[in-house]
Amino acid sequence: DGKDNVVIICSIENFDPIGIHTGDSITVAPAQTLSDKEYQRMRDASIAIIREIGVDTGGSNIQFALNQHDGRMVVIEMNPRVSRSSSLASKATGFPIAKIAAKLAVGLSLDEIPNDITRETPASFEPTIDYVVTKFPRFAFEKFPAADPTLTTQMKSVGEVMSIGRTFKESLQKALRSLEIGSYGLENVPADMSLIKSRLKTPNAERVWFIAQALREGMSIREIYELTWIDPWFLQNLKQIVDMEKEIEGSKENIIFSLDPLNPGPLESLILRAKRYGFSDRRIAQLLDMQETDIRHLRRKNNIQAVYKIVDTCAAEFAAYTPYLYSTYEVPYYRVQGSKDLRIQGSNPRPLGPSTPVVDNEANPGNR
């Protein structure tokens, strides 16, 4: 602001290594693999850069690349404006960057602008995130068969989806089934090992599915890392999803048996863990060769229901008056007051367009 106050709204980490345009990479907020020391180095560098460039008021986004083997950090770019990353950061945190930037431009300072969600804290309070946001790019190579599907520094995605969960695994799987490409998770990819290794080595739109398939085929995280240079933390999370799939598939007899109301099986823990990993009822049904309605019936029978938590910029430290909600399978949960039920009709989710994120009804602040 005009008083030289600076706040960091959000840290966003790319799933893919350097060499792929940020708009074509899966991104995660907050950053998951940085140590506190690395984060503070980036924070200090960001503040120094924005001051050196001469941004009097408003927002900027600064991108870094970090070599975690030797600690070398370089600046990729600095955008002294509201950008696509600003839009993602606003949605991820509930902090209205464009609105605040406009007020700063007319002379207000950060400590003079109230937070509309808490009505207590000023804009100089940095947002706190107690959830994980995943942005997944949407490609349309099926409409352009002559286009090269290899991902490079030139952006090729036509849109993106954003999802929120308590963990990276949950938010990733939510994003996968929001793409409207017929995917409900990390489904099997029919491919031999040579094709799998080729798809791992060459960045492409389906690489996350091929990583999961490589894990199913017995490749180690180290082998996949050496082909993709994707941080092992992300690969370990994908392995946990694949391991959960195997556990579900290995429980077919128990699941089927538990559908008999006279002989219920002790499956609450397995189904609850699967839902916390972000598995949809349809994906669980695919793994068990069952109907989606059977899984939903089993869930409800065992009182495994989605609950709702709030995006309030402060991790529930203060009361929230205008937060928005996301679903998860965890307690405690946010209770919506009132006895009336509402039915929302409209065009949401919006269809994907050029660099347009999908907004689903559940995450829309107006649909509460």
Predicted regions located by residue number:
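Intrinsically disordered, low-complexity proline-rich regions
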Residues: 251, 258-266, 337-355
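Non-catalytic terminal/interface segments that mediate subunit docking, oligomerization
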Residues: 300-335, 356-368
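Extended, domain-scale alpha-helical bundle/helix-rich regions
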Residues: 277, 283-287
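ATP-dependent carboxylate activation and anion-phosphoryl transfer catalytic cores
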Residues: 1-247, 256-257, 268-270, 274-278, ...
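Short, basic interhelical loop/turn and adjoining N-cap
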Residues: 227-236, 286-298
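Short alpha-helix boundary/capping motifs
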Residues: 129, 252-253, 284, 312
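Short, basic, helix/turn surface patches
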Residues: 266-269, 321
